[in-house]
Regions:
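A short, amphipathic edge element
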Residues: 54-66
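Low-complexity, intrinsically disordered terminal/linker segments enriched in charged
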Residues: 26-39, 43, 47-48, 53-55, ...
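Bacterial N-terminal signal peptides that target proteins for export
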Residues: 1-11
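Short beta-strand segments and strand-loop junctions that repeat across beta-rich extracellular domains
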Residues: 94-104, 129-130
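A mature extracytoplasmic/lumenal domain signature
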Residues: 70, 80-84, 93-96, 109-114
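Short, surface-exposed coil-to-beta transition loops
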Residues: 62-65, 89-95
Length: 151
């Protein structure tokens, strides 16, 4: 009986440690640059936030083709193309920046960041100058989520 009780305590302790390490590995402090997998809860939450943003300026719902998505330390940069129900493009591709606060993804205004005067298209083709202005406006934005500038 003592052996069974000791074994139960060992198994319970192992389960607690496994859960603790799993939760620690997923904590924001240990977040690594990644692209959430299709169908993952994180990707769904980000796309739901994109839909909310899109709804404010459109008269019809849309689905989105994800052209680019990177997440790191609670920040997400996503570039999407809005599509109608038949899969036809209904608007130009759009880059968006989101920050996760209290489990909710909130859009940050990329148009409010001072734009380049050297011919680049701000968030559509972020230059080093634009990225510097973005990080000044939104301290903490990891540079590794921002798409590389086109040449």
């Amino acid at each position: 009986m003592k052996t069974l009780r000791a074994l139960s305590l060992v198994l319970l302790g192992s389960a607690v440690l496994t859960f603790s390490f799993g939760a620690l590995a997923q904590s924001p402090a240990n977040d690594q640059l990644h692209t959430p997998a299709k169908g993952s809860p994180e990707r769904k939450a980000i796309l739901d936030a994109v839909r909310e943003e899109y709804k404010e300026g459109a008269d019809h719902p849309a689905e989105f083709k994800v052209n680019y998505l990177k997440v790191h330390n609670g920040w997400a940069w996503i570039d999407v193309t809005p599509l109608d129900a038949s899969g036809k493009q209904v608007a130009d591709p759009a880059p968006l920046l989101f920050y996760s606060e209290n489990g909710k993804w909130t859009a940050k205004d990329l148009n409010d960041v001072s734009t380049d005067t050297d011919g680049h298209e701000g968030p559509h083709d972020p230059s080093p100058k634009y990225i510097k202005a973005l990080q000044k406006k939104y301290p903490g934005v990891p540079i590794d989520i921002i798409p590389k500038k086109h040449k």
